Amino acid sequence: MAQLSFNAALKMNALGNKAIHDPTNCRAKSERQMMWVCSRSGRTRVKMSRGSGGPGPVVMMSSSTGTSKVVSETSSTIVDDIPRLSANYHGDLWHHNVIQTLETPFRESSTYQERADELVVKIKDMFNALGDGDISPSAYDTAWVARLATISSDGSEKPRFPQALNWVFNNQLQDGSWGIESHFSLCDRLLNTTNSVIALSVWKTGHSQVQQGAEFIAENLRLLNEEDELSPDFQIIFPALLQKAKALGINLPYDLPFIKYLSTTREARLTDVSAAADNIPANMLNALEGLEEVIDWNKIMRFQSKDGSFLSSPASTACVLMNTGDEKCFTFLNNLLDKFGGCVPCMYSIDLLERLSLVDNIEHLGIGRHFKQEIKGALDYVYRHWSERGIGWGRDSLVPDLNTTALGLRTLRMHGYNVSSDVLNNFKDENGRFFSSAGQTHVELRSVVNLFRASDLAFPDERAMDDARKFAEPYLREALATKISTNTKLFKEIEYVVEYPWHMSIPRLEARSYIDSYDDNYVWQRKTLYRMPSLSNSKCLELAKLDFNIVQSLHQEELKLLTRWWKESGMADINFTRHRVAEVYFSSATFEPEYSATRIAFTKIGCLQVLFDDMADIFATLDELKSFTEGVKRWDTSLLHEIPECMQTCFKVWFKLMEEVNNDVVKVQGRDMLAHIRKPWELYFNCYVQEREWLEAGYIPTFEEYLKTYAISVGLGPCTLQPILLMGELVKDDVVEKVHYPSNMFELVSLSWRLTNDTKTYQAEKARGQQASGIACYMKDNPGATEEDAIKHICRVVDRALKEASFEYFKPSNDIPMGCKSFIFNLRLCVQIFYKFIDGYGIANEEIKDYIRKVYIDPIQV
């Protein structure tokens, strides 16, 4: 709907002079900067025009007498002896001349495409090479393995895994610590370094390394109390390491007040564990090696995975082997040492986490379309190991974790796999809080991010998803407000997902944001920091940048074509309408090169619909609108002689476009589809006539009547049918109504458009006399309801509609081409983002301009 009504008010007596002088009733100044006032008796039409340069004259024209009276200092334009409105819209931010000057080397040079093709092959090879997971070494875990002893032939103890001890000996950093050199985290360095010093001291070797390591620990222990928050795992494990170091005679400042506090806190938690004779709390299992004093080593064996590990942790597994001699633990560790060349990672296997994370990473970067088969293979693998209990990092993980499960739920559902959100209930405590709230380390924060993202895909009445949203959203907002982590990449991701949740996230905008914040040297954190080479990958980033720029160059060519068409057709000279070619193009939310014809058709039709919207609301009389509608119904240009010339021109441009696009549709579909194409246009213009009749009669419809009419006049029907028929897939006649009007998904997306629009435009429309909005109709149906009540109700309706639309979209339907479904479904995105704060179509604001610049104008530096 246009945001400017035909009249500023229906009752001149009710408004009086206030309509002219009250700034509340002249709110159009900032959006349309014009107003009409009609009186019942004399049908007096008042045009008030305010130019951008300040107040100007207002001309009052009486249609009954033909006389005019200047009531302020401006002039009026009369067309065919009928006063017409000529709206002073916000200027077009992307003028024809601006678009035509765009240049890029990525369209003309084949070098970029050739390099992109090479990278696609390399990344496919990476997919094909996926095994149990590629992950960086962990000094902390390797030191645990190095501490293990065996009995030599002379009865003395010796290292059971000397290769692990050698690795520790050879991998100290220059500052005396152990860890990932490029990333410093105090807790990570202290765990790695303390355990490495212990391992060397146990075997009385590396005296120089021990001395340097002890000095590093002593210097940094004093900083520990300055950390914002210590993870629960650290609070259990680190005091235990200090006890071991003290027993070995390693010289450290054990009497520091904060160290004593940590030890006291640990003792209290150990008392709780001792009281739970048959169970170790789930949130403490990850710190198993810090619980040696209280573990029943017979009972703990029930937590052993099929691969012999405990929670896929080499450190925990080494601790159990040290205390039990279990052969399966030995085999697990021995195999890891062979695989990683004398060291071990912080967890293994990670085959499920790696596959899910790689798919998620590829799709975030906007390059998923190049790897459809590889993605399917990876997700088929994950789905084979999916469980109602959830999943862990690897297929043999005995205890599921929230991060992998939430990521799996989202990714699998996104790709049409049947997964229930009830799996999330396994990660809530008795108070309904998810396990992730136990601590605020990076990995736990990451799990809440994926919990939030999973809840984006909620279906109606999914309690688990609603609970996840209620937990995750405030958690993440608080994390942003308090800055509990210095992880820049993660925080940028949190900012994006909170600001632009899935129903508002335009694919190209998401890709641009992810590329701009991508870190190919990124680390994750469990007990210690770790890298996953398949994710911290420069090849993926390089391809994403090249692909974005190559696709952007195509989009620029399309925009040039479209702005040129708009100008040459004469539509750019129409002064009663908004000129929003770039914004309408952005609204398609479809970026793939193969859908070029779809985008072009959608944009041309959409631009004309904006014009028709403004024509109906601003320019045309009711009789003229009826004549125009009759021409549409009869598909006949000969009925236009009674309407103004500019309206005739608009009709002819539209009619010519319909013929051209229909010819293109015939080529793709192999048959004439005009009968299908005409129907939504007839419905569309019939609704305009109905709305005008209600307005002229001063009638406010019921909420139900309103939706039946206004959800159609929002215009998705006409602007989507021909584009989806140009997507290259055959759409049978009986399938058209399954994907288009009146399908459930189509109506739900239209409903979300209509009502989301209303929440940001109703006040300005009300001030200008356009009484029928969703808010007003709801208040009419519910006497006593306030505007706030109505908005809350509408937001609930929109939320429900989006959930139902998601259900319809993901529901299996083999006869409906997926590209067509996606095109319709993705149109929900633009209305959510365009009306996030204001009327993004009516007001050409900088935020929308910035979106378009990022996606279509500014290339990414390669």
Swiss-Prot record:
Mg(2+) 2 binds at residues 613, 617. It holds the Pfam family Terpene_synth. GO terms for molecular function: magnesium ion binding; taxadiene synthase activity; terpene synthase activity. It is an enzyme of class 4 (lyase). Keywords: Lyase, Magnesium, Metal-binding, Taxol biosynthesis. The keyword Amino-acid biosynthesis does not apply. A motif (DDXXD motif) lies at residues 613-617. It comes from the Eukaryota. Binds 3 Mg(2+) ions per subunit. Mg(2+) 1 binds at residues 613, 617. Catalyzes the cyclization of the ubiquitous isoprenoid intermediate geranylgeranyl diphosphate to taxa-4,11-diene, the parent olefin with a taxane skeleton. Belongs to the terpene synthase family. The Asp-Asp-Xaa-Xaa-Asp/Glu (DDXXD/E) motif is important for the catalytic activity, presumably through binding to Mg(2+). This is Taxadiene synthase. It comes from Taxus brevifolia. The lineage of its organism: Eukaryota, Viridiplantae, Streptophyta, Embryophyta, Tracheophyta.
